[in-house]
Amino acid sequence: MNDLMTKSFMSYVDLKKAAMKDMEAGPDFDLEMASTKADKMDENLSSFLEEAEYVKAEMGLISETLARIEQYHEESKGVHKAESVKSLRNKISNEIVSGLRKAKSIKSKLEEMDKANKEIKRLSGTPVYRSRTAVTNGLRKKLKEVMMEFQGLRQKMMSEYKETVERRYFTVTGEHANDEMIEKIITDNAGGEEFLTRAIQEHGKGKVLETVVEIQDRYDAAKEIEKSLLELHQVFLDMAVMVESQGEQMDEIEHHVINASHYVADGANELKTAKSHQRNSRKWMCIGIIVLLLIILIVVIPIITSFSSS
């Protein structure tokens, strides 16, 4: 059963064996009843694993979606035309929408699996429940990895957006912008009165306006993407709460399993000690009887001999 706790996914046969082993270890094990329960396990475990594989596949697709978002983001850093920036922004937005749809589907499926697990616990008892919950917990751990991957990408995109604005500022003015100026350009809808006035005086209105339009497009893209990413992030956060909650339940289950194994081990040791005491008691009893017989013989034989002589 400990193996079940440490593996994310197990085959159907392994799950069934683990659950059957738990039932056989129970105090009220009945062969006929176990056979009936095994038939029920055949039904619910096979369909359950199909659902688990579906969730696992969807999480794989989300990882692929994140990889494409990162690819489009890297491409956007090398383009300057408004049309190209807009095209890549649309691609990123579409990927985010797709990822959001998959994340919501996974969240819904995990909630359904949780409800089914609780029902299984009520109807079939803890062995099958622990088997199913262990697999569900493995899915959540995988989901948590995807969530951390997404969070890293989100932070990277917003950080590099500021770096892009800084580079464009340097291209126009020949100077490096400090954090305050970058924030001003971004929050003022790419205006930044000081930046615009100085740049127009030094480089002409046409070139500056072209750069400002590019920064504006990047700003619009960044805000739109950030809004979508925040929505996706909220879904991940909701599922993270589910991960922690189920993780605590799994820790409690594992704690009980470990305690049970300790109790069994302690009981076996106590039984072994009791048997040892019993053997020692019998040994000393035999020795006592033998000594008593020897004493009787030592006392009785001389008496008999004296009577015979007289």
UniProtKB/Swiss-Prot annotation:
GO terms under cellular component: cell plate; endomembrane system; phragmoplast; plasma membrane; plasmodesma
Biological process, per Gene Ontology: cell division; intracellular protein transport; vesicle-mediated transport
Pfam families linked: SNARE (PF05739), Syntaxin (PF00804)
Keywords, sorted A to Z: Acetylation, Cell cycle, Cell division, Coiled coil, Membrane, Protein transport, Transmembrane, Transmembrane helix, Transport
t-SNARE coiled-coil homology domain segment(s): 212-274
SUPFAM superfamilies reported in the protein's UniProt record: t-snare proteins (SSF47661)
Cytoplasmic compartment residues: 1-283
Ranges that cross the membrane: 284-304
Stored Gene3D superfamilies: 1.20.5.110, 1.20.58.70
Tissue: Abundant in flowers and developing siliques. A low level expression is seen in the seedlings, roots, and leaves.
Entries under InterPro entries matching the protein: SNARE, Syntaxin, Syntaxin/epimorphin_CS, Syntaxin_N, T_SNARE_dom
Membrane topology according to the record: Single-pass type IV membrane protein
Modification N-acetylmethionine occurs at: M1
Family: Belongs to the syntaxin family.
Self-association state and partner proteins as the record states: Interacts with SNAP33 and/or NPSN11 to form a t-SNARE complex and with KEULE.
Function: Involved in cytokinesis. Acts as a cell plate-specific syntaxin, required for the fusion of vesicles at the plane of cell division.
Record protein name field: Syntaxin-related protein KNOLLE
Gene symbol of the encoding locus: KN
